[in-house]
Regions:
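Short alpha-helical donor nucleotide-sugar binding micro-motif in glycosyltransferases
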Residues: 344-345, 352-357
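A short, well-ordered alpha-helix in the C-terminal region of glycosyltransferases
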Residues: 411, 418, 425-440, 446-452
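A conserved mid-protein helix/loop that constitutes part of the nucleotide-sugar donor-binding site
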Residues: 120-128, 289-303, 410
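Aromatic "clamp/platform" in nucleotide-sugar-dependent glycosyltransferases that forms part
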Residues: 365
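Conserved acidic donor-binding segment of nucleotide-sugar-dependent glycosyltransferases
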Residues: 397-398, 402-409, 418-423
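Short hydrophobic beta-strand element within catalytic cores of glycosyltransferases
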Residues: 382-385
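Short, structured helix-loop element that forms part of the nucleotide-activated donor/catalytic region
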Residues: 149-156, 244-247, 313-338, 349
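A short, active-site helix/loop in glycosyltransferases that binds the activated sugar's phosphate group
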Residues: 232-258
Length: 461
């Protein structure tokens, strides 16, 4: 096959070695004019404007701006069928070995396919789901295209079968025939929708949505294809919150009544309370990148008076995903000992820290159902939460949590000020938050919902 590679940035550099060796690259293209005329393995880098002079079967896009480049190619006269995303092109031809976990046994088998294994909400929900299914007597495997080594080691040692299958979101059914050995496949998170649609005609498949709007822009390259396949799929779709449902339906034109709200549940752990002599500890927990808006937190802390800053603690906890964004935050908190970045923590390490946390703060631009808030409620901790989150419907302001206007630094500072001025309400609001957990997010309630839905799937799909 003759192909043109469009895009020579990080995605190309990280994946060029995976391109099929039998394919002939006839040209490289990029929108960076400084690259024109250079050669890669004897093949020239040229302007996209020159595409008409080449004979090719496919244009393989190796860029995070895939949708924009597709539109550019369409305007240049390239047909839709000749445009393909690079990772999809690489992995849809890969033959996947059968996971080691699939062994002959009487128990029913469930595969949870997710986008990434690590110490973050989507993966932790998979762990909680897997444990609930194991307790119900199912054999469970979790598979993802990438994974954090420490996370995989920790939960493998706890008896959960974890598999890393590179390129899994783009796999073709003929290359994963072993998937028929599973009774149900749960595609966890929207980035797994291509796999879900690929297999849904042959195996009971559900899609469980958690996403905020930004994820849909990242998947916009496939929007038209997804919309068409959804019209005739047997796929059963769930969402963890009304916001997650509405984001999906607004993106692909799906009817809301066809999506079932299915909240997750987490196991119960009650923390102790350390004696801190009146010190209040506020914490933001989550991956460090712009969507989570940790800088909103640090900016709001700056609005408090010096005594309130120095007499209390303000923690940032999470893995750095955006180095430039993190540098701004770390620079800002230099020589400010009251604001600390504690780094990424395992679930065990985070549990130990919770004894010393009084109030969890959520600053995100949007969150469908942030697991950090559910975990805080489970632990009897109150939260400050922006109003543009799926969890806000469960919060009664100043009863079990505090709601503030999204992106409003002044309102966030006022929320922290409220707890500093009214320290006596923290424990009572935490107790009320625990009641929300018990009513909606306990593992017992989750397993009840799970049994009901699995029974429905087995009877109707």
């Amino acid at each position: 096959m003759k192909i043109i590679i469009f895009g020579l940035g990080k995605i190309y550099r990280d994946n060029a070695h995976l391109l099929p060796s039998q394919d002939e690259i006839v040209a490289y293209m990029d929108n960076n004019k400084e690259l024109y005329g250079q050669c890669i393995d004897g093949v020239k880098v040229v302007s996209p404007m020159d595409i008409a002079v080449y004979e090719y079967d496919k244009v393989v896009i190796m860029s995070s701006y895939a949708n924009e480049i597709r539109q550019q190619l369409l305007q240049l006269g390239v047909s839709e069928g000749r445009i393909v995303y690079g990772l999809q092109y690489i992995y849809e031809r890969k033959i996947y070995d059968m996971p080691q976990a699939i062994v002959p046994e009487k128990r029913k088998k469930i595969l949870i396919a997710t986008s990434n294994l690590g110490y973050h909400g989507g993966a932790m929900v998979c762990i909680f789901l897997a444990n609930a299914l194991l307790e119900e007597g199912y054999s469970v495997t979790i598979a993802a295209p990438i994974g954090d080594a420490a996370f995989i080691k920790e939960y493998s040692q706890k008896g959960i079968q974890l598999e890393v299958l590179e390129g899994l979101p783009y796999a073709k059914f003929e290359n994963i025939g072993w998937i028929l050995k599973f009774d149900i496949v749960i595609a966890n998170t929207y980035p797994m929708i291509l796999l879900a649609l690929e297999i849904s005609e042959r195996v009971r498949t559900v899609l469980w949505l958690h996403e905020s709007k930004n994820v849909y822009s990242e998947m916009s390259f496939w929007r038209s294809d997804i919309e068409q396949k959804l019209l005739k799929t047997k796929l059963k779709i769930y969402a963890v919150s009304e916001m997650a449902r509405d984001n999906f339906c607004g993106e692909v034109g799906y009817r809301k009544e066809q999506v079932t709200i299915f909240e997750y549940g987490i196991p119960s752990v009650l923390d102790g309370q350390a004696d801190r002599n009146g010190t209040v500890t506020f914490a933001v927990v989550g991956t460090i990148y712009p969507l989570k808006q940790q800088k909103l937190f640090t900016d709001a802390v700056e609005l408090l008076n010096k005594r309130q800053q120095n007499d209390n603690r303000f923690w940032i906890i999470g893995k750095i995903a955006d180095q430039e964004y993190a540098k701004k935050i770390l620079k800002q908190i230099e020589n400010k000992p009251y604001i600390q970045y504690l780094g990424e923590k395992s679930q065990k390490e985070l549990s130990a820290l919770y004894d010393n946390i009084d109030v969890i703060v959520v600053c995100s631009k949007q969150e469908s159902l942030p697991i950090v808030v559910v975990e805080a409620f489970m632990r009897g901790k109150t939260c400050i939460v922006c109003d543009n989150t799926g969890i806000s419907k469960y919060i009664t302001d100043k009863v079990n949590g505090y709601l503030y206007k999204t992106n409003d630094i002044g309102e966030l500072a006022a929320a922290m000020q409220y707890f500093l001025d009214n320290k006596n309400v923290i424990a009572e609001m935490g107790k009320n938050a625990r009641e929300v957990y018990e009513e909606h997010f306990s593992l017992e309630k989750f397993k009840m919902r799970l049994r009901k839905e699995i029974d429905w799937l087995e009877d109707n799909l």
